[in-house]
Amino acid sequence: MDLKNSSALPHITVATVVEKASKFLLVKEKANGQIVYNQPAGHLKSGESLTAAALRETFEETTWRIKITSLLGIYNYLSAANGVTYIRHCFIAEPIWQEPEAKLDSDILDAVWLSIDEIIQKTAELRSPLVLTVLKDYVAGNSYPL
């Protein structure tokens, strides 16, 4: 088996939970032909640290500069859509400033701020169950030092 290119290997991803005025920063994106909501998230690049990836992905998908304050958790998710296992490292971050002139990634339709209630109402439109899982952990006060 060629492990280097095997779909049996988990994909390492990062995500951020960013809260401002009781609203959470989410991205509205097109994935697999559907419009869905997700935390700013993405894959780790070769040689990149987890926190650097989280900073980069959040900026590329939202145009927000953030400060990572802690680790929320590490989550394992098996996608029924493609059979891939994702290991998501989710960080808690504070918004610092937005660069409105910056362009969003091409697959991102918009960056939005939604309350937890608004997110729950969009459960069917969430990219994966992890979106709500990590928010529930955040609201419960989970946090680990970097």
Outline where the language-model segments fall.
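Active-site-adjacent beta-strand/loop module that shapes the phosphate/pyrophosphate-binding cleft
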Residues: 77-100, 112, 134-139
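Residue-level preference for beta-strand/loop junctions
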Residues: 8-10, 35, 85-87
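Nudix hydrolase/Nudix homology domain
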Residues: 34-37, 106-146
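Short, solvent-exposed loop/turn elements at beta->coil junctions and helix N-caps
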Residues: 4, 72-80
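Conserved Nudix-box catalytic region and its N-terminal flanking loop in Nudix hydrolases
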Residues: 20-60
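A short coil-to-beta-strand element that immediately follows conserved catalytic motifs
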Residues: 65-73
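Acidic, metal-coordinating catalytic segment for phosphate/diphosphate chemistry
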Residues: 1-15
